[in-house]
Amino acid sequence: MRIGHLSLKIAAVFAAVSLALAGSAFAGSVSGTIKFSGKAPAPKVLSVNKDKKVCGKNKITDDSLVVKNGGVSWAVVSIKGAKGGKFSKAMKKTTVDQNGCIYTPRVTVMKAGTKLIVLNSDKILHNVHTHPGKSKNTVANIAQPKFKKKLKMSKRYFKKPGIVKVTCDVHDWMTGWVVSTKTPFVAISGDGGKFKIDGVPDGSYTVEIWHEKLGTKTMKVDVKGDTKLDATIGG
């Protein structure tokens, strides 16, 4: 990620994914902070060894673990078992950009069974290589030359809910994540680890928190109106 632009990028994704969802007449919200247990390492500056005129304009850091004031960004928070709700436009028409030789946003969520739109703002050769979770197996491997500004990836690649890792064989430092889901009750933690999921019907649910570096954590929550939920992961 280009230094100085990270907070803005995280805030934009947080706002898009946290749009109000339609629920029952007794729907409330779940909000809180995803906290990091321990001392976070300083972000490393990655080596840019190809297409330096485009990729080397700004320093690129390893954003696999971003912690600010003890809060973890890019954690995906899902509420399991809640009924109703509507997917936001951002989740039904999910877009990822290749800009400055990084995937932007680093983590995004989409409605399972929809297409993923991948932009190429760099106007150089990229290839969109997707993998199931952290496996090295290939789901799709599609070249995106400089003249192809928009790539529409078939919904068959995202038919089932799950975590998809996105890499680029041309630029080996590029990494992104797409989480396909059947529930609209999901959010990505923003700057400082803050998240909010609106429109959640009252009830008892399981909350799943996933982070690319820190793994998965589940916990219970009783929702009644506006409910606070803080969680600590990692360490």
Q: How would you name each of these model-derived features?
A:
Residues 2-14:
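Bacterial N-terminal signal peptides that target proteins for export
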Residues 17-19, 62-63:
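A short, compositionally biased domain-edge/stem linker segment
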Residues 19-27:
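Sec/Tat signal peptide C-region and signal peptidase I cleavage site
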Residues 26-235:
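Extracytoplasmic copper-binding redox domains, predominantly the cupredoxin/blue-copper superfamily
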